[in-house]
Design a protein with these regions (language model features):
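Nuclease-adjacent, charged terminal/linker segments that flank catalytic cores
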Residues: 1-138
Length: 139
């Protein structure tokens, strides 16, 4: 763990970060401090500001509040493990769920948005999987 002092704030972060990672961590931690808590989480008994404290992790953070129940329903229907670091502000699993679950609630809107990435997309096969999507594949 390394303490970075930036703009008068002290950030407890991993020892080695690229410039991009450092910028992203600072952004995510500043958001966490402004909207959730200034309390750190711990990894191997060391405090890290990008980790959420256990109390918030148990409440399902950093999942976006309006999709938390949808995430849990999806996880029951298609069993998958929550990542070990789901309680990290830079969690890829949380980012994916926070981005795609709200979008995929409406397959027509989702198709219109996703066609920008997959130009030959016509529609989403809503009769398959969970309205045509699945967050994780473990089978």
């Amino acid at each position: 763990m390394k303490i970075y002092e930036i703009d008068g704030n002290k950030y407890r972060l991993p020892n080695e970060l690229t410039d991009f990672q450092l910028q992203m961590y600072i952004h995510l931690i500043n958001w966490k401090w402004a909207h959730l808590t200034q309390e750190s989480g711990f990894f191997k008994n060391s405090p890290y500001d990008a980790l959420l404290p256990d109390e918030l992790k148990l409440q399902g953070y950093p999942l976006y509040r309006p999709i938390k129940e949808r995430f849990l329903e999806h996880q029951q229907r298609f069993p998958f493990k929550s990542h070990k670091f789901l309680g990290h502000m830079a969690s890829s699993q949380a980012a994916c769920a926070n981005l795609f679950l709200p979008l995929l609630e409406d397959p027509l809107v989702a198709a219109k948005v996703l066609v920008a990435v997959k130009t030959d997309l016509k529609s989403i096969a809503t009769d398959h999987l969970d309205r045509g999507f699945r967050i994780e594949f473990w089978d």
